[in-house]
């Protein structure tokens, strides 16, 4: 129950802060969104390069039945 009360209080104060300092929020978002997109793009590029580099062999996977027991 305390977490619900804390959550509602945080939502109310957050909405109050966003409405009171709207232009500051938009300035922050205008600076933060491009930086976040750059970071997400680098992560996506790195994971794509890593998946291309990994060999695609099915030897030794757990899905293959073991004939020798």
Curated annotation (Swiss-Prot):
GO terms for molecular function: metal ion binding. It is found in: Magnetosome membrane. GO terms for cellular component: magnetosome membrane. A short loop (residues 21-31, which is probably in the magnetosome lumen) when inserted into a Salmonella flagellin protein (FliC) binds magnetite, which may be used to purify particular forms of magnetite. The chain crosses the membrane at residues 3-23, 32-52. Residues 24-31 are lumenal. Belongs to the magnetosome MamI protein family. Essential for magnetosome formation. May bind magnetite. May be involved in an early stage of magnetosome nucleation. This is Magnetosome protein MamI. It comes from Paramagnetospirillum magneticum (strain ATCC 700264 / AMB-1) (Magnetospirillum magneticum).
